[in-house]
Amino acid sequence: MVDRKSLVNEINKGCNSQSFLRCLNDKVEFVKEIREIYEQSFKMYAQEITARKMDTIAALENAFFRLDRDLSAEALMHRNARTFAVAMSGAVACVAFLENRNLYVANTGDSGAVLGSLNSDGKWIARRLTNEHNTDNVSEINRIIAEHPKQERDTIFRQERLLGQLLPTRAFGDFRYKWTAEVIQDFVCFRSSSSSSILLYPALFDVPTRNSYHRLNPSDKFLILATDGLWEFLTPSQVVGIVGEHLANKKFLEPLRLSGQNMTLGDIALQLAQRKANQRNRPLDQNSATHLLRVALGGTEYGIEHSKISHLLSLPKDVARLYRDDITITVIYFDSDNIGKLPKASSG
């Protein structure tokens, strides 16, 4: 994370928003027609946050609310097909920020974060750091019902979706469900001329985020961030167990290292024999996220079935969503030896 002083210096140098982006796989560029609009929003936001002092939790919450508010303002102030396409679309997010031993997680929607820890008995423990924002979460249902008139109580949720359409109950964008009927009538034209396309009351209000805080311990080994597509296949406990097992077996993908300096030929032979015996546990993937994806898509009670993976990945786009959702996984490993040496700064 860029600190306040560095951000001010970069702004004074005339930086743009992409100066702070790092993409691992693809080149990231804003659509030409709306690039300048986003740059204006970024500069205004950057100037405001450098003039305000906020603790970490407040900064994360403010960032979520501000992004959603800007998406709405950009569409209403700069009316064109591009800005409205963004405003009508929806996106969820799950963000983690690590500062010394302080781990902060913020999310909106149905992506999730799970912490993997190893207890004193050598067993993997899964700790959910986020709550799903969908109809599986009773508190979410109660929250939305409380925000609506009584006459909508029996119709706001249908087929386990908001208005029978939206699966996440919190998201960026999706302003068709957030703007008032007056705004929709004045600015938006749906293909359907039916009055049912316009809601009498907004179905969603803002994009409230949920934050969590955890102080890391040496027993905390990794953090998994993933979209809902993964959690539809595997539970948090299963995910942590799979990553933990992969972490233990990944050493067999590395070159053999002798365990001591004064080893005899017999010691070396024993180590080689043990390595050979454990080769059956050798994973196919060096990357834990790739391994997790392979198990999610191809796992069976008899092991990984690669034909199942091939089938799920080769489905046509128009039917793929009926069988699997898009899956994005990030696995972050912690240096257990170093965690105990870090300062125990207070949360905030």
Functional labels for PLM-detected ranges:
Residues M1-G348:
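PP2C/PPM-type serine/threonine phosphatase catalytic core
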